[in-house]
């Protein structure tokens, strides 16, 4: 039962978020062989001024060994 959480800055349209959720769902279904009913996708908007604390330090820096795609920036770039 994959549940994918996408954290992003505010400002993307509902259409863009829906399109991304559909693309993620399609890829999860194809690659991991789950049915559509098993996949859920959430979008969490985080303000740019909160990104370092709420996302980078909490979900990236402190979980570096769990990232399958690492960012090309660090906390000093924020």
Located regions from the model:
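A domain-level signal for the structural core that forms small-molecule/cofactor-binding pockets
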Residues: 2-78
């Amino acid at each position: 039962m994959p549940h994918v959480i996408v954290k992003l800055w505010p400002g993307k349209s509902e259409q863009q978020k829906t399109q991304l959720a559909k693309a993620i769902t399609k890829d999860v279904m194809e690659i991991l062989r789950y049915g559509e009913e098993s996949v859920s996708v959430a979008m969490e908007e985080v303000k740019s001024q909160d990104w370092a604390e709420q996302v980078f330090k909490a979900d990236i820096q402190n979980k570096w060994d769990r990232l399958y795609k690492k960012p090309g920036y660090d906390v000093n770039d924020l």
